[in-house]
């Protein structure tokens, strides 16, 4: 359904305000592409302004709501992020206002750390089960994306496809984040173009 092969990646409500999330939705809709919720859940402003909205399921589960899964146009399971492969994140307490805290069911004004691993599965076999669970929740109506940080793209692409993903999202190290240490941002991971070739090789072999 998308008009261009470029989408807006997930940026959390909390890191961005409601107006910014709405603006991203309007911009994506004007260009015929999708935007993504990010950590912290879905806002009504974002859903209302976005023609195509991808709901991210992250290890933290902050703001996770099954009803919002059904309102989304696709679901993206975040296994990793290119700017911090293998690492979690943190949202500073100064950004945790009453609404953000309420959506995340955490205290207002306190730094909030995000885990790097999902609490309810540990490997590719469990990922397949999680994909089936999400399909059941959404009545098999939503495509399932798997987002991986570009660290070992050949193997991760293979595992995601075999687990039943409809789309593999390959996130390179240049994606950027304000929620991790500089050593991750500057020195860990692979640029998107370099990782893309390995991912394509994996897809060709699977065919």
Task: State the predicted function of each range.
Residues 1-118, 126:
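N-terminal capping/small domains of soluble enzymes
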Residues 118-207:
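Glycine-rich phosphate/ribose-binding loops and adjacent secondary-structure elements
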């Amino acid at each position: 359904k998308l008009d261009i092969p470029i989408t807006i990646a997930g940026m959390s409500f909390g890191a961005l305000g409601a107006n910014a999330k709405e603006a991203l939705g309007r911009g994506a809709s004007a260009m015929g592409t999708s935007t993504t919720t990010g950590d912290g859940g879905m806002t009504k402003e974002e859903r209302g302004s976005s023609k195509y909205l991808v709901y991210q399921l992250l290890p933290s589960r902050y703001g996770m709501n099954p009803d919002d899964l059904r309102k989304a146009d696709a679901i993206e399971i975040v296994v990793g992020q290119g700017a911090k492969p293998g690492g979690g994140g943190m949202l500073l307490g100064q950004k945790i206002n009453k609404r953000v805290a309420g959506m995340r069911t955490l205290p207002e004004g306190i730094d909030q750390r995000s885990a790097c691993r999902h609490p309810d599965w540990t490997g590719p076999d469990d990922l397949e089960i999680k994909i089936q669970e999400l399909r059941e929740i959404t009545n098999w109506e939503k495509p399932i994306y798997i987002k991986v940080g570009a660290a070992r793209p050949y193997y991760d692409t293979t595992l995601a496809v075999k687990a039943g993903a409809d789309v593999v999202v390959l996130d390179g190290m240049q994606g950027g984040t304000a929620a991790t240490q500089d050593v991750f941002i500057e020195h860990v991971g692979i640029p998107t173009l370099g990782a893309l070739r390995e991912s394509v090789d994996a897809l060709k072999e699977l065919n």
